[in-house]
């Protein structure tokens, strides 16, 4: 894992209206090439969902954990889940399809539970999955992200509206997206690193430029805020 502790993720879902599977794979491979050759902050992570205990009772089913490289994070799905994570002093993985307000509430539950169990979480850093779509035309950026997600959200019967989900991710021009990402980090007490997904962007050259620029700006942001 790189010292900057950022990464990318891919949504493992395909629908006919989006694009051919071969193009989806080609775009994903291009993302990996950019990471390898042109940037320095991104980790490539593999998701493996397990459970925090070996017994599969109702409580542990609420607390799936996800391996990100060599690190283990608890998927922040409910107050019960994050209380369980706090008891073990394990970091959280915040979902891209939750509202920012829900993420903040879950973090508050986590911190309160850690205090209750007398667990030191001062050095714990969480992760937040975010979709990023940058376009000089913000309407186009949001439209591309909406098209990319709409069938997945319909299939999973998401409780949150697609407009709220888009507003809880990052779609717009570059400066707006970067500011929004920083705001979300601050809302979570600067205790989160990010997993970005750029795959909703149709323009591959624009995606490459974005990833390289994000690379530079995120490194500077972390240095300015002593997040090494």
UniProtKB/Swiss-Prot annotation:
Keywords: Flavoprotein
Name of one Pfam family that matches: Bac_luciferase
Requisite cofactors: FMN
Coiled-coil parts of chain: none
Cystine crosslinks: none
Cofactor: how bound: Binds 2 FMN per subunit. Each FMN has a myristate attached. This flavin-fatty acid linkage is probably the result of an enzyme-catalyzed reaction, most likely the bioluminescence reaction itself.
A molecular-function term among this protein's GO annotations: alkanal monooxygenase (FMN-linked) activity
Family: Belongs to the bacterial luciferase oxidoreductase family.
Quaternary structure note: Homodimer.
Protein name per Swiss-Prot or TrEMBL: Non-fluorescent flavoprotein
Organism: Photobacterium leiognathi
Lineage start: Bacteria, Pseudomonadati, Pseudomonadota, Gammaproteobacteria, Vibrionales
Annotated gene: luxF
